[in-house]
Swiss-Prot record:
InterPro entries linked: eL8/uL1-like, Ribosomal_eL30-like_sf, Ribosomal_eL8/eL30/eS12/Gad45, Ribosomal_eL8/Nhp2, Ribosomal_eL8_euk
Protein name, as recorded: Large ribosomal subunit protein eL8
GO function terms (MF aspect): RNA binding
Subcellular location field: Cytoplasm
Source species: Encephalitozoon cuniculi (strain GB-M1)
Any Pfam family hit: Ribosomal_L7Ae
Main localization (coarse): cytoplasm
Length: 206
């Protein structure tokens, strides 16, 4: 023991029950929501409030599910076959922030889905601007869990498709038009629209 140094007694934090954890999480969400509506939200962040409708999201997910990567069991079966690399290279959904960013920068990505529920949102805040710069179609969806299901993960921040099979080209072009009409064509509007406080109150606070 060092003279003059106070010995710290470890304090055990109380273990919360499942109900207490749910109550705590709800309280945090309420505080975040209250804060979000009491300050001005910059356009770069507020643009993530514009998401695909439930109907459009369902159509996008159905197409992306056709190109979902193989899971562990499917991979094991493939590797046990006589020639695992036999056949053409499969068209699959690409995921992972760095990988998707690289595909956008090289203009290989054709449609990017970005999650609006990423925390912190700063992780993906640059993606819409990057897509606009490179001329890549993008859409924002409400839930990162939904995107995770497309690639056999719990959650993921973004996914993209670089190509589709000939039989899906018609529906894919329709989805590109839908995504562009909501996001790419309205990029300037989204990047000039502030959120949070009503405009009058925000101007008064300034």
């Amino acid at each position: 023991m060092v003279l003059g140094k106070v010995k710290k007694i470890p304090v055990e934090e109380p273990r919360l029950t499942k109900e207490q954890k749910i109550e705590r999480d709800l309280l945090i969400k309420k505080k975040v929501s209250k804060l979000a509506n009491s300050i001005r939200i910059p356009p770069a962040i507020y643009q993530f409030r514009t998401v695909l409708s439930e109907h459009d999201t369902k159509k996008f997910v159905e197409l992306f599910m056709k190109y979902r990567p193989e899971n562990k069991q499917e991979k094991r079966i493939r590797l046990q076959s006589e020639d695992p690399k036999k056949g053409p290279k499969p068209i699959l959904v690409k995921f992972g922030l760095k990988h998707v960013t690289n595909l956008i920068e090289t203009k290989k990505a054709k449609l990017v889905l970005i999650s609006a529920s990423v925390d912190p949102i700063e992780v993906v805040i640059f993606l819409p601007t990057l897509c606009r710069k490179m001329g890549v179609s993008y859409a924002i969806v409400e839930n990162s869990t939904l995107l995770g299901k497309l690639v056999n993960l719990k959650t993921t921040s973004c996914v993209c498709l670089c190509d589709v099979r000939p039989e899906d080209e018609g529906s894919f072009k329709e989805m590109l038009r839908t995504a562009d009409a909501i996001f790419l064509d309205n990029y300037e509007t989204h990047l000039s629209t502030w959120g949070g406080l009503p405009q009058k109150e925000a101007d008064e606070k300034q």
